[in-house]
Design a protein with these regions (language model features):
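Membrane-proximal alpha-helical signals and transmembrane carboxylates
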Residues: 1-347
Length: 347
């Protein structure tokens, strides 16, 4: 079955208003049909707007009986209207269906995560976590880049939305996460950091990564990874500073096939396994320290492990976890089980 290359005509309407509800009323007086939000698939805020805070709009949306709690929250690196105007479905004939499907790519790439309105709202009200949203942008010639300045080997994951070197008729792309402190946007994570986040939070289903090739300098080995066990997290306080240990278990299938390299050799697999462990430990540690030291916000919900150290709710509340999280230190341990994903193990 082939997808249609033509999308049904859609209309983007903009209105200046003091609130979402009054804006909808104004639009209803202008168009021939009453707006129904029961099939709304995504809510888009521009970065510029999100930096000022989105709590008022969020509470209004949550209180709207028509909007489903699984509606996605997207923070656009451009104006929200520009983001909507650049939606160009190539394999779906219905724009709403396109929004629904494009956000499921997190299940097999881990470069973004499917963040619903209910998830964002719960994290906003939760004293042990901070909210985050999907990071979106526009893919066009002016934003396509041929290379990245990232120092990690997994260069394909070091992009954010509107930076990927993809030439496509699709006008929008979602890659990375928008990080919040309270209701205000404070920063962004790229695709590689998002992968680390999903491993820590046990939301990784599968992904393809590239690790440095221990047998050929300057080249990489592609690997398909999944989590074999849930990440085990332990938190304790040392001089009131949170010390967080994360034990991670992954399985990997080698996708690359290199001439002269025997993937059936135990020593070869052991070496690749050690490189995989070191690569993931470095990337995940970098992500954790970025959230703690730079953004100062706990989007991985480590607070749920800290709360058990307090005997009463008042003790927990007075500890001010959101402020203390920036003092955290981390220890990441990765244990990988690697095998060749090819029918051939030696050529």
């Amino acid at each position: 079955m082939a997808g249609s290359t033509q999308s049904q005509q859609s209309t983007v309407t903009s209105v200046d208003c003091s609130s979402i509800d009054t804006g909808i009323s104004l639009v209803n007086s202008y168009i021939s049909k009453k707006i129904n939000l029961s099939h709304c698939k995504a809510i888009v805020f521009s970065e510029e707007y999100a930096y000022e805070g989105v709590s008022e709009e969020l509470f209004t949306l949550v209180n709207n009986l028509e909007i489903r709690p699984d509606c996605n929250i997207i923070i656009s690196r451009c104006k929200a209207m520009d983001y909507l105007n650049n939606v160009k479905p190539t394999l779906e004939s219905v724009s709403a269906r396109y929004y629904e499907l494009i956000l499921t790519s997190s299940e097999y790439t881990a470069y973004s995560e499917n963040i619903a309105l209910k998830d964002f709202y719960n994290s906003l009200l939760n004293s042990s976590s901070s909210p985050y949203a999907i990071l979106g942008g526009i893919n066009n010639k002016s934003t396509q880049k041929e290379s990245t300045t990232s120092s990690v080997y997994d260069s394909e994951g070091s992009y954010k939305a509107d930076e990927t070197p993809i030439i496509s008729p699709n006008g929008i792309e979602n890659m990375g996460l928008a990080v919040f402190s309270g209701d205000k946007l404070v920063g962004e994570l790229d695709g590689s950091q998002t992968l680390s986040h999903m491993i820590i939070t046990n939301n990784l289903k599968s992904a393809v990564i590239s690790i440095p090739n221990p047998y050929s300098q300057g080249s990489t080995i592609s690997m398909y990874i999944t989590q074999s066990k849930k990440t085990k997290t332990n938190l304790k306080f040392i001089n009131n500073y949170p010390y967080i240990t994360c034990d991670i278990n992954v399985t990997g299938d080698i996708l690359s096939l290199e001439e002269g390299l025997d993937y059936s050799n135990e020593e070869v697999l052991k070496t690749i396994q050690e490189y995989t462990n070191a690569f993931l430990e470095q990337n995940i540690s970098s992500y954790l320290y970025k959230t703690a030291k730079e953004y100062k916000t706990d989007i991985a919900s480590f607070g749920k492990y800290a709360i058990k150290n307090y005997s009463t709710w008042n003790d927990w509340y007075n500890s001010n976890w959101s402020a203390n999280y920036e003092n955290s230190f981390f220890k990441v341990n990765v244990n990988s089980s690697i095998q060749s994903g090819q029918l051939f193990t030696k050529i």
